[in-house]
Amino acid sequence: MAVGKNKRLSKGKKGLKKKVVDPFSRKEWYDIKAPSTFENRNVGKTLVNKSTGLKNASDYLKGRVVEVCLADLQGSEDHSFRKVKLRVDEVQGKNLLTNFHGLDLTTDKYRSMVRKWQTLIEANVTVKTADEYVLRVFAIAFTRRQPNQVKKACYAQSSHIRAIRKVISEILTREVQNSTLAQLTSKLIPEVINKEIENATKDIFPLQNVHIRKVKLLKQPKFDLGALMTLHGEASGEEKGKKVASGFKDEILETV
């Protein structure tokens, strides 16, 4: 019998001895920090590939936008129907310093407010803040029945709607123009603007469920590290490195 290759014997398959690499071993975790305007500054963690060669991890982290429930940032379930967007502007070690990027209502909250027998009034303005941020602010409001009203419906006339929309636009424009982005954020959290709109329009038509439905950031000024550090309460904007004197000489060389 001739001795040779047995074709029936199974050959070893390629790739069986290849070493399996855990994809998470090439990544590292970073902590996301919210601005000091929020009570809970620890937002969470995010993953990114480790810095290798010319690829720097901070380049992939800057500009990343995260969406967080406002209830988690404030520690209160009263804010559970609002979502806040935070944008990563600076990397400090393993901490990511963020800034306000937008605000929105949850879909279930928005749909639960739309009902029969009432009028929905919407308004939006595009305004620049005191620190050169361009924002588009959307507001919604619903009519409610007059005191001692028997009729079920509380529809507003077109003239009422136009007058209310004008008042809402004026209040939004004034509040945004006279505030920095941090000051505006502190007004949006306790819903100060909502109550002001409701009080200003009660003589035209009584309103209910007045909310800032959405805040969208359209344009931002040139990045200022000092302003961001002040916003996070970690350092003042005036702290800078000291300039080395040009006539410096090594003391050891002079004593030899």
UniProtKB/Swiss-Prot annotation:
Protein name per the record: Small ribosomal subunit protein eS1
Family: Belongs to the eukaryotic ribosomal protein eS1 family.
Oligomeric form and interacting partners: Component of the small ribosomal subunit. Mature ribosomes consist of a small (40S) and a large (60S) subunit. The 40S subunit contains about 33 different proteins and 1 molecule of RNA (18S). The 60S subunit contains about 49 different proteins and 3 molecules of RNA (25S, 5.8S and 5S).
Cellular component terms per the entry's GO annotation: cytosolic small ribosomal subunit
Record localization: Cytoplasm
N-acetylalanine modifications at: A2
SMART domains recorded: Ribosomal_S3Ae (SM01397)
Keywords, comma-separated and alphabetical: Acetylation, Cytoplasm, Ribonucleoprotein, Ribosomal protein
Gene Ontology MF annotations: structural constituent of ribosome
Protein's organism: Lachancea thermotolerans (strain ATCC 56472 / CBS 6340 / NRRL Y-8284) (Yeast)
Pfam families assigned to the protein according to its UniProt record, in alphabetical order: Ribosomal_S3Ae (PF01015)
